[in-house]
């Protein structure tokens, strides 16, 4: 398991909890909503939820913002751009774009865990333009090519 040191800043000061791993083997840290007032997310509606946090990642690492499975299963709450990517040179507040795919309004409260943040190394590619690509068994088989 690769480790990285991530600097974190509370954007508005505040006393909100910093993200943390909820279990010893968790891959993601839970991110919480940093709200003054409750936020109501009606069915079909999407809103940007502030976390009150900004981070500085080491070079070669990204932070992926992912949905929480419990919110998805129990309430139909998902992330519009999943995963969201925080680049190592971004220094602004982390926001989470939530959408309500459920049938009931969902209330987001201050301090509620709304997403997970997973840190991952990444590679920067060098693109080489060619006239043809190597053949593979799959070829150009796309969506659903192996069955249903």
UniProtKB/Swiss-Prot annotation:
Q: In which pathway does it act?
A: Pyrimidine metabolism; dUMP biosynthesis; dUMP from dCTP (dUTP route): step 2/2
Q: Mind listing the UniProt keywords for this protein, alphabetically?
A: Hydrolase, Magnesium, Metal-binding, Nucleotide metabolism
Q: Enumerate the CDD domains for this protein.
A: trimeric_dUTPase
Where do the coiled-coil regions begin and end? none
Enumerate the transmembrane spans. none
Question: What InterPro entries does the record point to?
Answer: dUTPase, dUTPase-like, dUTPase-like_sf, dUTPase_trimeric
The processes (GO biological process) annotated in the record are: dUMP biosynthetic process; dUTP catabolic process
The family database entries (Gene3D superfamilies) matched by this protein are listed as: 2.70.40.10
- Residues holding substrate: 68-70, 81, 85-87
**Gene Ontology MF, one:** magnesium ion binding
| UniProt KW Magnesium keyword | yes
What's the family? Belongs to the dUTPase family.
| Family matches, as HAMAP family | dUTPase_bact
Q: What does this protein do?
A: This enzyme is involved in nucleotide metabolism: it produces dUMP, the immediate precursor of thymidine nucleotides and it decreases the intracellular concentration of dUTP so that uracil cannot be incorporated into DNA.
* Protein's name in the database: Deoxyuridine 5'-triphosphate nucleotidohydrolase
The organism named in the record is Geobacter metallireducens (strain ATCC 53774 / DSM 7210 / GS-15)
């Amino acid at each position: 398991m690769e480790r990285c040191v991530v600097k974190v800043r509370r954007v508005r000061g505040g006393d909100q909890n910093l993200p943390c791993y909820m279990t010893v083997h968790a891959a993601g840290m839970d991110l919480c909503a940093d709200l003054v007032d409750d936020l109501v997310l009606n069915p079909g509606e999407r809103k940007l939820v502030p976390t009150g946090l900004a981070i500085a990642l080491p070079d070669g690492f990204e932070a992926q913002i992912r949905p929480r499975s419990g919110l998805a299963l129990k309430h139909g709450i998902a992330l519009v751009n999943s995963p969201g990517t925080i680049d190592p040179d971004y220094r602004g507040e982390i926001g989470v774009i939530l959408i309500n795919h459920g049938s009931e309004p969902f209330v987001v409260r201050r301090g509620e865990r709304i997403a997970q943040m997973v840190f991952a190394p990444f590679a920067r590619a060098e693109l080489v333009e060619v006239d043809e690509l190597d053949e593979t068994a799959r070829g150009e088989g796309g969506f659903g090519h192996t069955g249903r």
